[in-house]
Amino acid sequence: MANTPEPLTTEAAQVVSETDLGAAKLLEPSALWLEPYQWVSVAMLVLIAIMLWKKVPSLVTGGLDNKIAEIKAQLDEAKALRAEAEKLRDEYTAKIANAEKDAEAMMENARHEADAILEKAEADSKALVERRKKMAEDKISAAERDAVDEVRATAAAAAAAASRKLIAEKHDAEADRKLADEVIAEL
């Protein structure tokens, strides 16, 4: 048996067990009556016990809980921001709709005012033309009256001058006395 391995022994091993691997037998080390897989299990139990004693799971869960709380707060904040953004969007949509209605109403009002101004301007211009026509007619009438008055005054002045001249030519002191006596007698 040239290929058969030699049994291994360690100084720490007090008990050596044999394992049958087919044709060859291997010796596995053991200490304090425990096999290697049992030592791994004991080490894991000790590690878990130390972790429990140092409260590592509560630290881990506390950290996870804090992280969960932060994420939840961020989600709540995001929901609040989204709700606020939607509210602002709806508000501005309503404002835009109102602004469009107001603009349309203002345009309609401006059209009505422009029409009213045009109608008033037409009426005012007609009234102005009528007033100016009447003023022109009044000026013409006044000029005619002034001309007639001037002609009358000129005629009266000419008649008075002619009367004076005639009276002066045909009327003497005797006629004046006679006329004065008649006027006095009538009184």
From Swiss-Prot:
Principal place of residence: membrane
Protein localization: Cell inner membrane
Keyword Transport found: yes
Membrane topology: Single-pass membrane protein
GO molecular function: proton-transporting ATP synthase activity, rotational mechanism; proton-transporting ATPase activity, rotational mechanism
InterPro entries: ATP_synth_b/b'su_bac/chlpt (IPR002146), ATP_synthase_B_chain (IPR050059)
Tree of life domain: Bacteria
Keywords: ATP synthesis, Cell inner membrane, Cell membrane, CF(0), Hydrogen ion transport, Ion transport, Membrane, Transmembrane, Transmembrane helix, Transport
Transmembrane region(s): 36-53
One cellular component (GO) term of this entry: plasma membrane
Record family assignment: Belongs to the ATPase B chain family.
Function: F(1)F(0) ATP synthase produces ATP from ADP in the presence of a proton or sodium gradient. F-type ATPases consist of two structural domains, F(1) containing the extramembraneous catalytic core and F(0) containing the membrane proton channel, linked together by a central stalk and a peripheral stalk. During catalysis, ATP synthesis in the catalytic domain of F(1) is coupled via a rotary mechanism of the central stalk subunits to proton translocation. Component of the F(0) channel, it forms part of the peripheral stalk, linking F(1) to F(0).
Subunit details: F-type ATPases have 2 components, F(1) - the catalytic core - and F(0) - the membrane proton channel. F(1) has five subunits: alpha(3), beta(3), gamma(1), delta(1), epsilon(1). F(0) has four main subunits: a(1), b(2) and c(10-14). The alpha and beta chains form an alternating ring which encloses part of the gamma chain. F(1) is attached to F(0) by a central stalk formed by the gamma and epsilon chains, while a peripheral stalk is formed by the delta and b chains.
Stated name of the protein: ATP synthase subunit b
Gene from which this protein is expressed: atpF
